[in-house]
Amino acid sequence: MKKKTKGLKTQKVPWYGRRLNVYLLLIGVTVLVYFRVFTLGYTMLDDTIFIKENQEYNKSWSNIPVSFQRGLFNPTGDSYYRPVFLVDFIIESKFFGTSPAGYHFSNLLFHVLCVLLLYFFFLRLKIPDLTALILTLIFAVHPVLTQAVAWIPGRNDMLLMIFFLSGTLLTLKYRETPKWQLLVAQFLILLLALFTKETAVIIPIIILAVLKIDNGKWKTENGKFNFLLLLSWALALVIWFLVRSAATLKPQDFTLTDLLVNGFNRAPVLIQYLGKIFFPFNLTVFPDIRLIAPWWGVAALVLLIGLIIMSRSYARPLTWIGLGWYILFLIPVLVVPASLNDQVFEHRLYLPIVGILLVIGQVSICLSSMIKDQGSRIKDQGSKTKDQNPSNSSSNSSSALRPLFVQQVRQGVIVFVLLLFSGLTFYRIGCFKDPVTFWTAAVDGNPTSAYARMMLGLRMTEPAQMKQRFEEAYRLNPNEKMLNYLIGKLALDDNDIPRAERHLKKELEFSQIPDNYFNLARVCFLKNIPDSAAFYLEQVIRLEPRHPQANHNLLLLYLQLDRRDDARRQIQAMRDKGLEIPPEVTGRADLQP
């Protein structure tokens, strides 16, 4: 006998509750906003180092383990340790070679993956479907994250986010189903995160806080579960520390006091970054903390505090987790010494911005609840009034419409913000089109940077324009590394020997550039000081042993100076290096060993 179903109603699932619809929307919006990245080239800010200059390094699979034993930019004289980043370029070089388009494609792919993982993460935190979708869309199109996606080296922050979110999702799954496979998987992913960026040491703190909440409230976890998880994290940290300690990195001479002083001096960055999240109108590709107007940040801070108080979301744990998330992931930016990096690049907000989105999500949930409660009260009050005085029905109807109006206004604001952010991001992608465009934007956004003007000068094709940019940079900072070398090289090309010598010698105070020594050798040769020329050529070979022209010229110079023993040693050294020896030298009997 069939059961009667007449009168039963099935609740219709809204479009944002259908997962496939949401996935397609998130992917579609992200690709639509960022499709311009396929037209981008290099910026000449580190990207060519990892792809072009490291071309030989990237060719060999055997350099994958080597990447865990060296620094990022230099095998021995570097403070940055990013082995996963180097390994990524080794792998991708097999597919893309030195074509920037392929690396821009993978950057976009990483961003899409981060967007999807973030949406899953919000849902796992029991954030309502529509709120999770809106927060994820804001992340996907936010202008402050443009550099992370459009600038090829910005991928490191995206890789860290991928490992962080996937590891957190696995840990949350392990809480529900404590299988050893999940425990091992999250352990391996944490290791990858640590070898991606040192910031990953903060990840266990954030995950612990997330594990302590359930349906928006604090809870106590099983002791055995926590012990196994903590043990796996401790093991990952020990392995990372030991491997990193064995790497050939440049020793750091700053103390804990130095880090604390740096953190105090750079604390305004927290407010400046907050301003860029809420009001992304003062963005630049090469920012300087001293030039960023504080007012946007102060306004954003006041707005955030006001929203938290007004919505009473301060009672929700995720609000505090979000604030802690934002601050903790920015600590490395605060304490990094200016000698290592003095720029407050916007791609570093890729992970911290999620903390602010969590706070905004809690504010939204609380405000929605307040509007819903207000609507229910008005409806109940209207029903009572109608029973008592039917003539006031029109007044009751207008009161009931108020929550609906507020809801419509909020929806309009969300759509406007998403469209505005998408437009700003679409426009900003163009700043990364090519070196001239990028460094022009850098100078416009940071006019006091000698480095930016120097790099723009290097991109100029006309010597007069190049010279003008170098002179502008010199007026800003005569001690800028590499600048005196470039000015001296131009002066040498113009046959201005005294000026060339002055600048080339000054560069020795700041750097050890092989070509700088080579040009000093040219100066000495033109001044007919062969002994000094030989000295500078020896320095070139010390720094770059296989420099062909330096080896060739030094050999001929030894012969000119009648330094036959030195000439014999130089001939043998060139043979050992596989360098060609001039034919007029090889046949001389007096130079045979």
Mark where each language-model region is:
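C-terminal luminal/periplasmic domains and tails of membrane-associated envelope-modifying transferases
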Residues: M1-K9, V13, D373, D380, ...
